Regions:
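A glycine-rich, hydrophobic loop/mini-helix early in the fold
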Residues: 61-79, 93-96
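Charged catalytic cores and adjacent phosphate/nucleic-acid-binding surfaces used
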Residues: 1-35, 40-58, 74-81, 85-86, ...
Length: 237
């Protein structure tokens, strides 16, 4: 089984270089990782994409990802319109209820990141759970949220993650377990992240499935200029 950590930030804004992150991820047993940038401009996204392409190798896959931080729904849709066709994985930073809702209502989003952040609830309700399932939007279990929290805050985060796993089991939306790492020292091995998933209510098989390549190949096919729709491409001949 090929396993991927789909939410990692190298320097900048992370603390470790992309090369160091990749080297450490290899040693931990990953098949590939997604390196994320914040799409503050087209220049940043293009530069990030080139860096990722240069880092790919036959024995280790590196995936282009962006993490959108939007204050309004309009800002979110503008970023999606601008950058969805330039990257392989789109992550939307959650927390705000309106952003959470907008993110799961479009199939242009791959992952909603820590929807429970800074909230008194899990960030996902039953209506949003159905939308996430319909649009194949993964709800993230971000290990860094646990790693960098303490006492009551950590207890609340874990409880909210458990609630989202219950919703995932009931409504069938996908889950993405990620390290959320900003440093190579925040990376964890596939088995460790799978164990984290089990600790918040996932079955072991489902936890490992959440680490698989899944959407990557589908999205790479969509980025092909000849792609029209699933199963349909335009032949150059």
């Amino acid at each position: 089984m090929r396993t991927y950590d789909l939410h990692i930030h190298a320097s900048p804004p992370g603390e470790s270089s992309a090369v160091d992150v990749i080297d450490f991820a290899k040693r931990l047993g990953w098949s590939g990782i997604a390196l994320s940038c914040f799409p503050d401009s087209e220049e940043i996204v293009n530069s990030h994409a080139k860096m990722v392409d240069d880092l790919k190798s036959k024995d280790f896959d590196v995936v282009k990802a962006i993490e959108i931080k939007a204050d309004t729904i309009n800002a979110l849709h503008k970023a999606l319109d601008s950058f969805r066709r330039k990257t392989e994985i789109v992550i939307v930073r959650g927390g705000d209820q309106e952003i959470n809702r907008a993110a799961v209502e479009t199939n242009q989003v791959d992952i909603i990141s820590h929807p429970e952040s800074q909230r008194s609830d899990s960030g996902i309700d039953q209506v949003m759970a159905r939308s996430a399932a319909d649009n194949n939007v993964s709800v993230e279990l971000n290990f860094r949220q646990i790693l960098n929290s303490y006492r009551k805050t950590r207890v609340h985060i874990i409880a909210h993650m458990r609630q989202n796993i219950k919703l995932a089991k009931k409504y069938g939306f996908p889950v993405a377990i990620t390290s959320g790492a900003y440093s190579k020292w925040e990376l964890r091995a596939p088995r460790e992240l799978a164990a984290f998933g089990v600790s918040v209510g996932m079955e072991l098989e489902g936890a490992f499935r959440s680490l698989e390549a899944g959407k990557i190949e589908v999205n790479r096919n969509k980025l092909n200029q000849n792609w029209v729709m699933p199963g349909v491409t335009i032949s150059d001949g």
